[in-house]
Amino acid sequence: MLRSFLLIVATVSLFGQCKPLPLATSPVSDAVRAPHRSTHETRFVRTNDEERGATMTLAGVLRDKAQTKQLLTSWLNSGKSVPSVSNKLGLKRMSLEQAIHHENWKALTTFQRMKSKKAKAYAKYGTGYQTEAKTKENLLQWVMRGDSPKEVSSTLGLLGLSRRKIIDHQNYEAFRTFLKYRKQWAEMQGNGFTKLTT
């Protein structure tokens, strides 16, 4: 257990000290890195007046990107399944070919991505759902920086919750992992280990 902790700490430390290697120069790589020169002042990426982000029509009302995101997030947090959202968007009884061309198709695919990302999540803090690897990397950084349990519980959204709510919270395991890493780091320092050397 201590070995794996040391390995993780060493890896995080090494990545922090790495510098990028210069690329070999060649006519091809120079051409790739050369700035793009165009006679046009603007670049049009969108076609057919398409909008970025998903919009949808629900109950005969067109929702803009912000409203669509709010509804999709609400459905995600309430545990709606992809088939139930497909039904709400009017796509369930359509063939795949018809559904792909429907105005709500992009909203459904956005919901599927959100659902998939949430399923892979280990904790939710900062910019949103985080993977287990990213969470553990952040936990180690917080330990090495000397963050207190109160600071970390605040970051993880656990501060001020009752014990029961903390145990049921999605970030509970991440907080327990932080406490474990913190204890291991204190033991290492007690044994004379003060810093990582490369």
Swiss-Prot record:
Primary localization class, coarse: secreted
Record-given protein name: RxLR effector protein CRE4
Top-rank taxon, per record: Eukaryota
Disulfide bond residue pairs: none
Induction: Expression is induced during host plant infection.
Motif segment (RxLR-dEER): 43-52
UniProt domain comment: The RxLR-dEER motif acts to carry the protein into the host cell cytoplasm through binding to cell surface phosphatidylinositol-3-phosphate.
Gene label: CRE4
Gene Ontology CC: extracellular region; host cell cytoplasm; host cell nucleolus
Naturally occurring in which organism (per UniProt): Phytophthora infestans (strain T30-4) (Potato late blight agent)
UniProt-annotated location(s): Secreted; Host cytoplasm; Host nucleus, Host nucleolus; Host nucleus
Function noted in UniProt: Effector that is involved in host plant infection. Contributes to virulence during the early infection stage, by inhibiting plant defense responses induced by both PAMP-triggered immunity (PTI) and effector-triggered immunity (ETI).
